[in-house]
């Protein structure tokens, strides 16, 4: 049941993340895949695998096979993003997934969660910054931290509260 739930969740995350990535980046196709080590993901198949490996697991003092070994595989145009994605592509993937998670929370509980973007904008070019800000524009209460306040102009920042820490003192920017 856990594997099926994870697969269903990753399917939804894949769909929404792919849309977000296409909007932010507009280039490659993002695909998320759930990878399990179980050949048979039925309850009986998983139980069978645990029974088969029980003595070995006791001897080794660890569970060798299990859902803890499952993984999320990320691809850009069918290439393993972990091996081939640039730092900018990796940042865009993470942001796409984060925004997708915000949308999933909204779908599940009916309201947006608070979003924290911790120094992520400094690594984006102007176009990607603006697209990210468009995605969260007035929908999501967002805290953006940065060491360099260079967000550029975006209408969603017109009514933003900007706080600056300068020499240990918190100041409000006007």
Show which residues each predicted segment covers.
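Conserved NTPase motor "head" modules and their coupling/switch loops across ABC/AAA+ ATPases, GTPases
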Residues: 1-114, 123, 127, 131-134, ...
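Walker B catalytic acidic pair
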Residues: 118-120
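Hydrophobic/aromatic beta-strand patches that form the interior of the parallel beta-sheet core
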Residues: 143, 161-163
């Amino acid at each position: 049941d856990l594997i099926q739930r994870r697969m269903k969740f990753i399917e939804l995350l894949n769909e929404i993340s792919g849309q977000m990535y296409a909007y932010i980046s507009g280039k490659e196709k993002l695909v998320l895949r759930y990878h399990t080590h179980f050949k048979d993901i039925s309850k009986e198949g998983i139980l069978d695998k645990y029974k088969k490996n029980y003595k070995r697991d006791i001897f080794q003092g660890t569970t060798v096979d299990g859902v803890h070994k499952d993984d999320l595989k990320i691809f850009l145009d069918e290439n393993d993003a972990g091996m081939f994605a640039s730092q900018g592509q990796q940042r865009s993937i993470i942001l796409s997934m984060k925004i997708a998670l915000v949308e999933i929370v909204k779908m599940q509980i009916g309201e947006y969660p608070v979003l924290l973007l911790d120094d992520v904008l400094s690594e984006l070019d102007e176009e990607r910054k603006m697209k990210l800000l468009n995605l969260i524009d007035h929908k999501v209460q967002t805290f953006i931290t940065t060491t360099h306040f260079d967000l550029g102009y975006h209408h969603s920042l017109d009514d933003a509260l900007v706080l600056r820490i300068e020499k240990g003192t918190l100041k409000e920017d006007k």
